[in-house]
From Swiss-Prot:
<keyword id="KW-0744">Spermatogenesis</keyword>
<keyword id="KW-0469">Meiosis</keyword>
<feature type="compositionally biased region" description="Polar residues">
    <location>
        <begin position="393"/>
        <end position="414"/>
    </location>
</feature>
<keyword id="KW-0221">Differentiation</keyword>
<feature type="region of interest" description="Disordered">
    <location>
        <begin position="485"/>
        <end position="512"/>
    </location>
</feature>
<feature type="region of interest" description="Disordered">
    <location>
        <begin position="389"/>
        <end position="414"/>
    </location>
</feature>
<dbReference type="GO" id="GO:0051301">
    <property type="term" value="P:cell division"/>
</dbReference>
<feature type="region of interest" description="Disordered">
    <location>
        <begin position="167"/>
        <end position="193"/>
    </location>
</feature>
<dbReference type="GO" id="GO:0051321">
    <property type="term" value="P:meiotic cell cycle"/>
</dbReference>
<dbReference type="GO" id="GO:0030154">
    <property type="term" value="P:cell differentiation"/>
</dbReference>
<dbReference type="GO" id="GO:0007283">
    <property type="term" value="P:spermatogenesis"/>
</dbReference>
<protein>
    <recommendedName>
        <fullName>Protein mitoshell</fullName>
    </recommendedName>
</protein>
<feature type="compositionally biased region" description="Polar residues">
    <location>
        <begin position="485"/>
        <end position="503"/>
    </location>
</feature>
<feature type="compositionally biased region" description="Basic and acidic residues">
    <location>
        <begin position="167"/>
        <end position="176"/>
    </location>
</feature>
<keyword id="KW-0132">Cell division</keyword>
<feature type="compositionally biased region" description="Low complexity">
    <location>
        <begin position="177"/>
        <end position="191"/>
    </location>
</feature>
<keyword id="KW-0131">Cell cycle</keyword>
Length: 649
């Protein structure tokens, strides 16, 4: 038996940790991912051999092909006696992982693409079906590596590991070779969002919870950008194009920091506020896109210089934002249409069954317009609008008249169709679009809402007919006209029992005075000048409006809110000439001081005491300067019912 026997010293050998890496590039939906690796892990084990043991080598070991069987040749090569030839266990497992899992496992288990390309290793080729038999040796296992669960792939959009079955199901999905450009943009958006769109289709909007971290990140970045923009706007404030930009940045910062006011506005204004908000957001988003696309899509040399100064990756970020904007704009348009349909249902329940067919036809026309907008071109949309089949203006009175005429078989003329009706036609649309702080809104049958505040209650028609009694006035006038011939009888008949018409007459002195007289003009001028001086006062912000007073001093407001009027109301009365004399305006200014002093006699509030001293000092300084005389108004203390005029006429 020609088997060579070699004597080797006692050694402790450990199997080599053989790793084979190769890079695989695959297409994850629409993204090119180059971070997938397949590793061959060989189980680590160590064994100890007895001293002066013989190593039997049946022949030279020839490494076979990675994809073929091992074959031995008849030629026996000479083996160097200084080297011990061995073959470790061919146990191997295949792993595929994304960049996230590689970084989690560490550099000992995973290698990046660049490192594997630059570092050279020895990569022996093995095949598990070789016929070599391990010599029978006495060994003991010292350490074994616990193999982890094999992971096949990872979705880079959601960082969720996918099993083999999910990969097969994804591979079986039909992928159209040619799609419409609009659909391709949406598909790329869905692929970039990972499994978010598939989950969203199964859940309602109220059941989807977004990450709070994104909210904090956007707020942090926006605040930082607002500060930088405000500094730049202040630096360039003398340029005409920077007019009011600093105010816009400051208001944006306030909007980011103050609490969300959507729920209070919905509670006070109703669903119309939500419709207005979505229309407002739609216009702002599209306006932002209009500004940016002027810089992106134009290619003159001057704009190219500007685009080169933009940060690297701006064009790619704009393109991805443009794709997502296309989707969100469509969603917003459908959102305020759906909200308007909900508003129409509430109006139908408010107005009764008569207005239901009209509102239903308007909502159907809106829905058909959106569907035609998704499927047809611009020519069809303009054709539908010019022929009268386009969208209606959200159930305006003009559309109700038009629908009633169509139901009766009467076709309105073109002049009647396109003739503007001013505020009558656009009242409801303006109610949704304009801000509630800028427009006075009243309740009517169209479903408009009241702005938050205090208003006179609406009176029914029957009450309005009963309040002005016309017959007693006529009888009173006729009887006085008949008794003019007897002047001696006028004195005993003066206190007539029917004196109710006298109480209904207005008690305002302005109705009995001539506003164009010299006295009336002088009083009006003094009140206007006094209101301007009050506006220039300092330390009156906390009493400028009762809402501010309630925020700063809630206990004082709770006890004394009905005992004084705020500074804003005093200024408005001066501008409207509601005061008969300037003394009344001064009395109301000092009425605030008197009310606070009375409150501080019973309660303790150091902040209120300090601020009322500042307020009183400002008022006294104003009243002691020209055109007023010193100590001219010291007799006016602000007490209820005090005598304002210290002289007799």
């Amino acid at each position: 038996m020609n088997i060579p026997i070699y004597q080797v010293p006692s050694v402790t050998m450990q199997s080599l940790h053989q790793q084979s890496l190769y890079q695989q590039t695959y297409l994850d939906r629409n993204r090119m991912v180059t971070d997938v690796f397949v590793q061959e892990h060989v189980s680590q084990s160590s064994w100890s051999m007895a001293g002066s043991s013989a190593v039997f080598i049946p022949g030279p070991i020839i490494t076979g092909s990675a994809h073929g069987h091992c074959h031995h040749t008849a030629t026996v090569s000479t083996v160097s006696p200084q080297l011990a030839t061995f073959m470790p266990f061919p146990g191997m497992q295949y792993y595929a992982a994304s960049s996230a899992t590689m970084n989690a496992y560490g550099h000992n288990q995973m290698y990046s693409t660049r490192a594997s390309a630059s570092v050279g290793f020895y990569l022996p080729q093995y095949h598990a079906s070789c016929s070599h038999e391990q010599p029978k040796k006495t060994f003991c296992a010292a350490q074994t590596q616990t193999q982890q669960t094999a992971k096949t792939s990872c979705d880079v959009g959601t960082q969720v590991d996918l099993d083999a079955e999910e990969l097969r199901s994804e591979a079986r999905k039909p992928r159209p070779e040619s799609v419409v450009p609009e659909e391709s943009s949406i598909s790329s958006l869905e692929s970039g969002a990972g499994d978010g769109f598939r989950v969203q289709k199964k859940l309602r909007n109220s059941e989807v919870k977004l990450l709070d971290q994104r909210l904090h990140d956007i707020t942090r970045v926006s605040l930082h950008g607002s500060e930088i923009a405000e500094r730049l706007a202040n630096a360039h404030r003398n340029r005409p194009c920077f007019k009011k930009i600093d105010t816009l940045c400051a208001r944006l910062k306030q909007d980011l920091l103050r609490p969300d006011g959507v729920l209070p506005n919905i509670n006070s204004q109703g669903i119309a506020w939500a419709v207005k908000d979505f229309i407002f957001v739609f216009t702002r988003i599209v306006n932002a896109w209009v500004i940016l696309k002027g810089y992106v899509y134009n290619t003159p040399d001057a704009l190219n210089k500007i685009k080169d100064e933009l940060p690297s990756g701006f064009m790619a970020s704009f393109d991805s934002w443009q794709i997502s904007t296309l989707s969100i704009v469509k969603m917003i348009v459908k959102s305020f249409v759906n909200l308007d349909e909900l508003l129409q249902k509430q109006k139908n329940s408010f107005s009764g069954k008569d207005g239901a067919p009209i509102n239903q036809s308007n909502s159907i026309s809106l829905r058909s317009f959106i569907d035609s907008n998704d499927s047809s071109g611009l020519a069809q949309k303009y054709l539908g609008m010019t022929t009268g089949h386009g969208p209606s203006a959200f159930s305006t009175p003009n559309n109700q008249i038009r629908n009633n005429a169509a139901s009766k078989g009467q076709e309105p003329t073109s002049s009647a169709l396109y003739k503007p009706k001013c505020a009558l036609n656009l009242n409801y649309l303006y109610t949704m679009i304009e801000d509630s702080e800028e427009t006075q809104r009243h309740v009517d049958a169209n479903g408009t809402y009241l702005k938050t505040g205090t208003y006179q209650p609406l009176q029914k028609e029957s009450m309005q007919l009963e309040m002005p009694p016309a017959k007693p006035n006529d009888h009173y006038v006729e009887r006085n006209a008949n008794q003019q011939a007897l002047p001696s009888q006028e004195i005993p008949n003066a206190p007539t029992p029917k004196s109710s018409p006298q109480s209904d007459r207005p008690r305002d002195v302005r109705s009995y005075t001539n506003p164009f007289s010299a006295i009336g003009k002088e009083v009006t001028r003094q009140l206007y000048e006094f209101s301007d001086r009050v506006m220039e006062l300092k330390n009156l912000e906390r009493f400028f409006k009762k809402q501010f007073t309630r925020n700063y001093y809630p206990n004082f407001y709770q006890h004394c809110q009905d005992d004084f009027i705020d500074v804003r109301a005093i200024i408005l009365r001066c501008e409207n000439s509601s005061y008969h004399h300037i003394y009344q305006a001064i009395h109301d200014l000092r009425r605030i001081i008197f009310t606070v002093r009375c409150y501080l006699q019973m309660y303790t509030d150091e902040n209120l005491l300090y601020y009322i001293d500042l307020y009183e000092r400002s008022v006294n300084d104003m009243l002691s300067k020209p055109p007023h005389y010193p100590n001219q108004f010291d007799h006016i203390m602000g007490r209820p019912g005090e005598k304002l005029f210290n002289y007799e006429i």
